[in-house]
Amino acid sequence: MTTETRSLYSQLPAIDRLLRDSSFLSLRDTYGHTRVVELLRQMLDEAREVIRDSQTLPAWCENWAQEVDARLTKEAQSALRPVINLTGTVLHTNLGRALQAEAAVEAVTKAMRSPVTLEYDLDDAGRGHRDRALAQLLCRITGAEDACIVNNNAAAVLLMLAATASGKEVVVSRGELVEIGGAFRIPDVMRQAGCTLHEVGTTNRTHANDYRQAVNENTALLMKVHTSNYSIQGFTKAIDEAELVALGKELDVPVVTDLGSGSLVDLSQYGLPKEPMPQELIAAGVSLVSFSGDKLLGGPQAGIIVGKKEMIARLQSHPLKRALRADKMTLAALEATLRLYLHSEALSEKLPTLRLLTRSAEVIQIQAQRLQAPLAAHYGAEFAVQVMPCLSQIGSGSLPVDRLPSAALTFTPHDGRGSHLESLAARWRELPVPVIGRIYDGRLWLDLRCLEDEQRFLEMLLK
């Protein structure tokens, strides 16, 4: 060991001496004596390794308390960190999909802080039904006879098939054998539910007679799957639910539908593309309809099944129902969200998903112009900051081919180097509240459709 190396080792402080320093008192109060000591030992080992390999001290050895504070602060950050979503995708699956309405947030907070009547009947002091209150609300909105709630729509489809068609055949058009994120495929779900898939028709064309010819003594269901995350266009043919229900009645086979996104209002009244609604399918005579709670409905993650009472009863009594049931927080948020639909005139103001989807391009353009000046002043030395028109998307497999006119702030490096864009995006992801945009066509785009808190946005980007 050289004299220089010995000198470097000698500069490493003892843990006891560090802990006596006043700067460590607040750290010990905040994070605990044990964790601070544990980290200091780890940092001493790191410093010795750097000395051994590089014959130098780490830069942070100049201020041990500051480095300990920085590391423990980062360690204490929640795994579920709030972010500013400027990707242009409103229902971003990786960012948690639908933002919850204030009424839903308040309902969840109350449910978390207190015992609730989850399965308790106040009238006779006996055991109540977990889904009962929400079932009544869903029946009022959709016109169904009964309803069942589970933890997501994949679970809803699994339960629907397992409870009504296990050991039997389910007839589905080839053009509707969808796959959604995470390799969730309708054929795989059928296999897990114990059903046999009977494909009919072709990818682009399926006729009523295809279903008719497929039905046999082992057929349990005729199934429609709404292709919410892709679109087949051109030379196509499909039969709608009403026609399939008529065929099902003739052949004595129930019809079920996996609707996927599940909008409870006609989106076209807000200038958005129309999506099929559960109440329309119930009115057409479909026996069971499943859809998501956290997509176009704008609530928490949940799988909702509405339909005929005798069919719902089979789902409620199936062993899988207990494994897939929703908890009290989900039910509280979902109930509060559904109640907003009873007053549709205020829905676009109170439901964040609808509010963001219906923001006009003109309003977003004005917002972008307002924010351009301070950002250009801050980043102008390295980037050209411009206001550009763009197209937002709904996301989460909803209305896949439809885009919403919007406006973005774009950052283009003066030197044209893509690495500068990657570096800027990485810096923004490290902010206390990360700002998430997207890199495209030599620019970093911040689509402002989902930006409601301008002050917090500027606080982050002007740091």
From Swiss-Prot:
Query: Keyword Cytoplasm on this protein?
Result: yes
Biological process terms from the Gene Ontology for this record are: conversion of seryl-tRNAsec to selenocys-tRNAsec; selenocysteine incorporation
Q: Which Gene3D superfamilies match?
A: 3.90.1150.180, Type I PLP-dependent aspartate aminotransferase-like (Major domain)
What is the top EC class of this enzyme, as a single word? transferase
User: According to the UniProt entry, which residues carry N6-(pyridoxal phosphate)lysine?
Assistant: K295
Looking up SUPFAM superfamilies in the UniProt record yields: PLP-dependent transferases
* Cellular location(s): Cytoplasm
Enzyme Commission identifier(s): 2.9.1.1
A GO molecular-function descriptor = L-seryl-tRNA(Sec) selenium transferase activity
GO cellular component, alphabetical, reads: cytoplasm
Alphabetized UniProt keyword annotations: Cytoplasm, Protein biosynthesis, Pyridoxal phosphate, Selenium, Transferase
Q: Does the entry feature the keyword Thylakoid, yes or no?
A: no
Which residues, if any, are the signal sequence?
Answer: none
Similarity comment: family membership = Belongs to the SelA family.
Free-text function comment from the UniProt entry: Converts seryl-tRNA(Sec) to selenocysteinyl-tRNA(Sec) required for selenoprotein biosynthesis.
Protein name according to UniProt:
L-seryl-tRNA(Sec) selenium transferase
Q: What is the lineage of its organism?
A: Bacteria, Pseudomonadati, Pseudomonadota, Gammaproteobacteria, Enterobacterales
Q: Which gene encodes it?
A: selA
